[in-house]
């Protein structure tokens, strides 16, 4: 595995009081890292020679400063997944949306405040498939310490980052996917905290292990950092109580299996009251595609070992659900409810913008430079708009701030247009500050040969209320199913294959905010759109860009 941390975070306390806000400072050097995985030697790109990358811990109200140094050969940006970036949208890290990428040998300092959020988020590269190896946890502690948790204080907190591994350079994987027109090849393994475990053909593969004490309560901070797959996760002989999702508290939900889509996080309490021994934790793919397509069928494993138990003791393996178990997945996703805090204003009841956004995959003619393409290439769209990243030397946010014409159009449709095929466009939906937006997200079968699948839809810049979700087609009568009392609060929703989800949010954050599928195979195909949120009254204004903001190079 990669070496231990190169740098320890420097915490500069601004006030002498223990509970005062602080500046938490890190330096992330992104560069090549030699690693042996699955019996193969590879060079991958990581932050600070670590896989996963460094865990960031802050307290609510702190300011986070990350000096990003790009020693890789690839332009890149870093995204702080789920952080509101209230009036700090220049730091969101969405490539060509809120910033131009940091060029090789370049650097940029991300600086933003984290207020009004607690729980488990994460950070990752937002440039090509580089996020397969450039990612880490971002943990936000309550301002008043563990007593601020709305559940009993855990004895131990354990980050569990689930990922994917390729035996090839991931940039080559992505490029080949473009040349064939069919997207990237499936991964060679799944990982838990960067390690595949022992359930593969490579004898002696690295496996994550955590030691626990009997009779305690652990808080597992579970993150799906995988690039293209939803996952089932279990620990043999143990059950969970889910207490948060996407850094928003939930009412306690008891389960023996976690279902988690790319981009999502789940906080789950686990009591260590099983017979002392060794127990496998395991994860494998949840795949709900309606057309059979190959997927990674490996199982990632780790070990929960009770203190005092010898390392050679046999370990029990959990029974994971079948890969296509939509019943178990639906039960998990649809059973979670939100736990409102006193400061939560509740679900806004007046809606200014009602939208229906369909999305899916379609077929397009091969482009001239897709030299390995045969017959057709994949394309993706939202409301028949296949999103195109701007090719001018400016990000969308800079174009908004400086009034640069011709970079984007403000004509993203509120409803699916009556057309076949798709149009390629950099189209945004413009809303006023504090407008309330409701979006029906509908998984659509654009092509009879491609079918449908689950799509994790992630919204930058906001949390949203998840009012309802279901299978089949949404119709207005389903509004009676809306949960307006205690809905989940999310930043990423797993929209079922051929199904729907309804989200609602208040646009109280000026800027350009990306909404896209968090399956990285689909993002470059165009499964994305942008919300343009106008300035409000002072101080709710988009500030000027940082002086060292990266410049675009076309």
From Swiss-Prot:
Molecular function via GO: copper ion binding; hydroquinone:oxygen oxidoreductase activity; oxidoreductase activity
Keyword RNA-binding carried by entry: no
GO cellular component terms attached to this protein's record: apoplast
Cofactor requirement: Cu cation
Keyword Repeat: yes
Enzyme class: oxidoreductase
Listed name of the protein: Laccase-8
Lineage: Eukaryota, Viridiplantae, Streptophyta, Embryophyta, Tracheophyta
């Amino acid at each position: 595995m990669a070496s231990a941390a190169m740098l320890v975070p420097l915490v500069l306390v601004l006030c002498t009081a223990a509970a005062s806000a602080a500046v938490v400072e890190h330096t992330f050097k992104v560069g090549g890292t030699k690693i042996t995985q699955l019996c193969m030697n590879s060079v991958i790109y990581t932050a600070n020679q670590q896989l996963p990358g460094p865990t960031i811990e802050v307290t609510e109200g702190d300011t986070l400063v990350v000096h990003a140094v790009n020693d890789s050969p690839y332009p890149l940006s870093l995204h702080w997944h789920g952080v509101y970036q209230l009036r700090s949208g220049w730091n969101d890290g969405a490539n060509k949306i809120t910033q131009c990428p940091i060029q090789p040998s370049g650097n940029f300092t991300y600086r933003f405040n984290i207020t009004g959020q607690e729980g488990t988020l994460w950070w990752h590269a937002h440039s090509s498939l580089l996020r397969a190896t450039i990612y880490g946890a971002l943990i936000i502690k309550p301002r008043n310490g563990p007593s601020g948790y709305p559940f009993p204080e855990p004895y131990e907190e354990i980050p569990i980052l689930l990922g994917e591994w390729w035996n090839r350079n991931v940039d080559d994987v992505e490029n080949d996917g473009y040349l064939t027109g069919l997207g990237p090849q499936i991964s060679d393994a799944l990982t838990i905290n960067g390690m595949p475990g022992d359930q593969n053909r490579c004898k002696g593969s690295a496996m994550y292990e955590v030691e626990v004490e009997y009779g305690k309560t652990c808080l597992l901070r579970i993150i799906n950092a995988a690039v293209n797959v939803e996952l089932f996760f279990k620990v043999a002989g143990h059950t969970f109580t889910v207490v948060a999702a996407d850094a928003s508290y939930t009412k306690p939900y008891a389960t023996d299996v976690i279902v988690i889509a790319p981009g999502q996080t789940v906080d789950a309490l686990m009591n260590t009251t099983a017979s002392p021994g060794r127990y496998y934790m395991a994860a494998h793919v949840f795949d709900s595609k309606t057309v059979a397509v190959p997927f990674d069928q490996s199982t990632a494993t780790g070990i929960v070992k009770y203190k005092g138990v010898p390392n050679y003791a046999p370990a029990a393996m959990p029974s994971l659900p079948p890969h296509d178990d939509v019943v178990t997945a639906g039960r998990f996703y649809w059973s979670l409810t939100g736990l409102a805090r006193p400061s939560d204003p509740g679900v806004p009841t007046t809606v200014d913008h009602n939208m229906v956004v369909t999305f899916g995959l379609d077929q397009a003619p091969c482009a001239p430079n897709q030299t390995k393409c045969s017959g057709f290439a994949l394309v993706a769209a939202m409301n028949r708009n296949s999103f195109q990243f701007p090719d001018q030397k400016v990000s969308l946010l800079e174009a908004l701030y400086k009034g640069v014409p011709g970079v984007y159009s403000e004509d993203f449709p509120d409803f699916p247009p009556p057309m076949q095929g798709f149009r390629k466009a950099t189209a945004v939906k413009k809303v006023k500050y504090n407008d309330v937006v409701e979006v029906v997200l509908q998984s659509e079968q654009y092509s009879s040969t491609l079918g449908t699948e689950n799509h994790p839809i992630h919204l930058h810049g906001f949390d949203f209320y998840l009012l309802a979700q279901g299978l089949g087609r949404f119709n207005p009568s389903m509004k009676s199913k809306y949960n307006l009392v205690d809905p989940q609060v999310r930043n990423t929703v797993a929209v079922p294959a051929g199904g729907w989800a309804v989200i609602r949010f208040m646009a109280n954050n000026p800027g350009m905010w990306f909404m896209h599928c968090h399956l990285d195979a689909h993002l470059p195909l165009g499964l994305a759109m942008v919300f343009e949120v106008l300035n409000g009254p002072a101080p709710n204004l988009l500030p000027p860009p940082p002086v060292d903001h990266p410049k675009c190079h076309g």
